[in-house]
Amino acid sequence: MSQMLSPDMTIAAEAVTKAKIEVKNLNFYYGQSKALKDITLSLPERSVTAFIGPSGCGKSTLLRVFNRIYELYPKQTAEGQVLLDGQNVLDRSQDLNLLRTKIGMVFQKPTPFPMSIYENIAFGVRLYEKISKAEMDGRVEQALKRAALWTEVKDKLNASGLSLSGGQQQRLCIARTVAVKPEVILLDEPASALDPLSTAKIEELIDELQADYTIVIVTHNMQQAARVSKQTAFMYLGELVEFDRTEKIFTSPREKRTQDYITGRFG
């Protein structure tokens, strides 16, 4: 049985003990193929954790287990435990709609709905809450402000979300996620399709959001992981090789495979 991995103890003790997500002995299968192998780690709340590793290492697969979005596809199964505030999200009695409001997700490619900017935000809220028009207006404004988009779109809320630039569309997707009041935000390569200026805005936004949300980001960009995260997990061939403070991972990793990856010897 693998040992629970938490970031180095030089992180303040309270940040380590207040785990938002605990993964215990997690295995994941695509059909008969084992994609995640006995993963165990603990993610602190209101902090940014990055998953890094070469393509096919399992980092996006692990991310998609957290809100069970893998169940949208056939022949994909998870074994073990993923605890959100102590409750196992893999329990078959879990309400998946409720789970996905608690754990929101933003994908690699911006995915605005083919509707107005306003409705992109309001649509998800209506699925879970009955609120007045005035309350909805406030919720939309608040979400767009949290995503650093309000000043750019406040005078064109009825315009199509598809009319926005790529970077604006991605921030709209973040606003849509924030609007349903999640506790955790999963980001799967959120800036990989964006230009450097839009990427910088997304990274600045991540830094601001961590005050209120637990954030997990998958990225191929190691410089980005170093800039935005407090903890980093390095994965390779479905295994968790090392998990520690981001600074330690990038300056003095314990594992040779980690050092080889971050220095470009493979990847």
Swiss-Prot record:
Q: Which UniProt keywords apply?
A: ATP-binding, Cell inner membrane, Cell membrane, Membrane, Nucleotide-binding, Phosphate transport, Translocase, Transport
Judged by the first EC level, this protein's enzyme class is translocase
* Catalyzed reactions: phosphate(out) + ATP + H2O = ADP + 2 phosphate(in) + H(+)
Cell compartments where the protein resides: Cell inner membrane
Q: Which GO terms describe its molecular function?
A: ATP binding; ATP hydrolysis activity; ATPase-coupled phosphate ion transmembrane transporter activity
Q: Which GO terms describe its biological process?
A: phosphate ion transmembrane transport
Range of residues in the leader sequence: none
- Quote the EC number: 7.3.2.1
Q: Which residues form the ABC transporter domain?
A: 21-262
Flavoprotein among keywords: no
Matches recorded under Pfam families: ABC_tran
Its placement in the membrane is given as: Peripheral membrane protein
Listed CDD domains? ABC_PstB_phosphate_transporter
Cross-referenced PROSITE patterns: ABC_TRANSPORTER_1 (PS00211), ABC_TRANSPORTER_2 (PS50893), PSTB (PS51238)
GO cellular component term, pick one: plasma membrane
Could you say which residues bind ATP here? 53-60
Asked if Signal is a keyword of the record, the answer is no
Q: How does it assemble?
A: The complex is composed of two ATP-binding proteins (PstB), two transmembrane proteins (PstC and PstA) and a solute-binding protein (PstS).
Question: Tell me, what does this protein do in biology?
Answer: Part of the ABC transporter complex PstSACB involved in phosphate import. Responsible for energy coupling to the transport system.
> What protein name applies here?
Phosphate import ATP-binding protein PstB
